[in-house]
Amino acid sequence: MSKRVYEIAKELDLDTKEVIGRLNAAGIEVKNHFATVEDPDYERVFGGGNGRSEAGEERGRKGRQKKRRRVVIDASATNRGPRAAAPSRPSRGRGAAREEAPAAEEREAPEVVRVEPGATVRDLGEALGVPPTRIIQILMGLGEMKTVTQTLSTEEIELVAEELGRRVEVGALEEPAPEEIGPEDSPEDLVEKPPVITVMGHVDHGKTSLLDRIRRTNVVSGEAGGITQHIGAYQVEHEGRRITFIDTPGHEAFTEMRARGARVTDIVVLVVAADDGVMPQTEEAIEHARAAGVPIVVAINKIDVPNANPDRVMGELAERGLTPEQWGGETVTVPVSAKTGEGIEDLLENILVVAELEELRANPKAPASGYVIESRLDPGRGPVATLLLNRGTLHRGDVVLAGTAYGRVRAMFDYTGQRIKEAGPGTPVEILGLSGVPEAGTRFEVAENERAARSRAQQAEERLRRQELAASGPRRTTLEELLGEGGAEELNLVVKADVAGSVEALKEALAKLSTDEVRVNVVRSGVGAVTDSDIMLASASGGIVIGFNVRPTNTAKQVAEREGVEIRTYDVIYKVIEEIEAAMKGMLAPETAERETATAEVRATFRVPNVGTVAGCYVTSGEIRRNNRVRVVRDGTVVYDGQIASLKRFKDDVRTVREGFECGVGIENFNDVKEGDVLEFYEVVEIPR
């Protein structure tokens, strides 16, 4: 195993120039930081501790002292160039010089500049305050040829900074916090808002059926596989008051979507089947609700089935800290039947009671803000986003900013599809007019004007672009680095879906498929049809394209055929997971196993000139094949394992010898075969995984 010079320097806390100097002094020629050093050479030069000199120790101590005083500067706020040196003051004597020494040392402490992964040569130059040409010169000295627009790896960024005597941290820059919208709300401006309810629970426990009964609409029949594929927000009225429901999918593949739902909700309705009890996703939903700090109302569903046992369910809930009110606890528990409608009115009544206790209020006079619940690209209407308002009132014509998407609200629809002009807190609305499809779960707010919204959206897009470049760029450029990964394979995927919620669910599910041997890497994901750009990225990364409820464009099909890129389309998420697992098994190197083909006894040995020792054998079982391997066993111990050099019957070369026949066997590179030895013949077969 070998190490690179910069890895040795980092491991021993030495300067890379010192490492290069020591290696060259020991007669090991290395030219730059990327040069490799074999283990024997490493042990010879640096063995017996870290091999640091006293000067190196002193420099390390000083470096650690300076490290304590580091100042972190974002690349976006760094100075345009190197600081001007402060004019030195005349010394007033030795004592004065000694007093000023610590201050001088403090000034020497290098500032730490934070640089984003995937930064280009130009970006790094701007961050460090040096011309890009200087960066290129340093890289050329390291044996790397780069242009100003090419991205740099983390190692390259760190090495360039070290050459310049600067310190960098490579990591995503913090996204600017959303601007505060006005002063703190005054109590007289606060009004009661509809409670936002998230329905959670185990798959097939009847969440969507329960909402269907409440809404009097049929959602289940429209979902592929009968399972909710993305989040929808709806409102119902009960006793003149509105309640907003969010339906989160229940399968474990949708963990991330459920967690997002819990963040924007006021109350969680936990659906548990009376005949099934608490299941893994039920416990997961409880954890999400507790993490979000929201109250839980339990709906024990399917009380109409013959083997329903609500008391057992209550006992299981009590074991998990949700003691029902009927048992003297604080958890509201309502037995219901989505099929017959029993208990539905009682459930809605209890939800409103809990909402009153929570005192859910918001300021409708403030500029609107909230979260994107769902988004998609509609062929006829363009980007469509479902928003849930937490605060303020959204009007038609307002400029909305949501991550990388922005735009003026051209049209707004309520949960029934009716056009509306404004919407208040706790209300889900569907809007048109955005420049793109925002990610589900993104915070949105009303911007002052389109120019301000465009500027902030471009900043967010630039951050996203850098992250994509860092994720999909060529990370393994040399044969040594490829071999250094232990032969691990990588399955690169481009994921496209009809709605953002499905994209998130797919990414979450695919990430769980990664193993030590095969990594699943989503190089790009998005909403909308599969385009030629997606195909080219998949081709460049050696991956495939996954389309969920979307189809490739005609151009994309042509490009895919030309580039040899496979496009797979699905409408149920479980099919995606199953087929990707199968593809991963095909990528794994096949396992090997030995299969014994024959055994033979050595009854005599013959010395043949120019050939060596030949074993005269009697085949006791099986059939010897010329291409078999042979194992020599003496007194129960294997003394040699190798290839057959020759296989003869009398004086003729043969390809096989069956059981009960005699033959002569020559063994490659082995002449110590003796009478009485046992020869085991076998073949190595590959077992696909």
UniProtKB/Swiss-Prot annotation:
Record's compositionally biased regions (Basic and acidic residues): 96-109
tr-type G domain sequence ranges: 192-361
Keywords: Cytoplasm, GTP-binding, Initiation factor, Nucleotide-binding, Protein biosynthesis
Region (G3): 247-250
UniProt-annotated stretches for the region G2: 226-230
Protein family according to the UniProt entry: Belongs to the TRAFAC class translation factor GTPase superfamily. Classic translation factor GTPase family. IF-2 subfamily.
Protein name in UniProt: Translation initiation factor IF-2
